[in-house]
């Protein structure tokens, strides 16, 4: 695993970099970058950490490609800065609304390896530094951990 290595990339629904299977069962931090038609540069959309980033990205790709965007959500999606991100979701179905929304809004997407360990602090630092638009620090804005 290499830092800043592209794990998967597509432009206009055409695969540019095939999914790198060596990331299956690999621990680490990934970032999803996207670009809208009218934009020239990619922006950071999401950052995630996992003990198996390859399998997590495969699940995310499934939602991007095979789950249709729905407009029947009831909870406004807000990021870690309490900014409304343009869509609403149904309880317990955040990912099934988020990824189809991203697929609808962005013409170019790439998953990138950021770090080779699942480290929450590094995930936070990267997400804040890159201003990951949809990132939520693990929970909706203003929601505390329950013990």
Features from the language model and the residues they span:
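Boundary/linker segments flanking structured domains
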Residues: 1-147
């Amino acid at each position: 695993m290499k830092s800043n290595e592209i794990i998967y990339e597509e432009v206009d629904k055409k695969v540019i970099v095939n999914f790198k299977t060596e990331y299956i069962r690999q621990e680490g931090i990934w970032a999803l970058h996207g670009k809208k038609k009218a934009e020239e540069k990619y922006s950071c959309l999401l950052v995630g950490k996992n003990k198996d980033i390859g399998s997590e990205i495969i699940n995310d790709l499934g939602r991007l490609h095979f789950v249709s965007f729905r407009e029947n959500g009831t909870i406004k999606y807000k990021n870690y800065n309490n900014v409304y991100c343009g869509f609403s979701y149904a309880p317990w179905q955040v990912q099934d609304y988020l990824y189809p929304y991203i697929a609808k809004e962005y013409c170019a997407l790439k998953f990138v390896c950021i770090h080779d360990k699942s480290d929450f602090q590094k995930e936070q630092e990267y997400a804040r530094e890159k201003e990951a638009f949809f990132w939520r620090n693990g929970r909706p804005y203003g929601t505390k951990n329950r013990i």
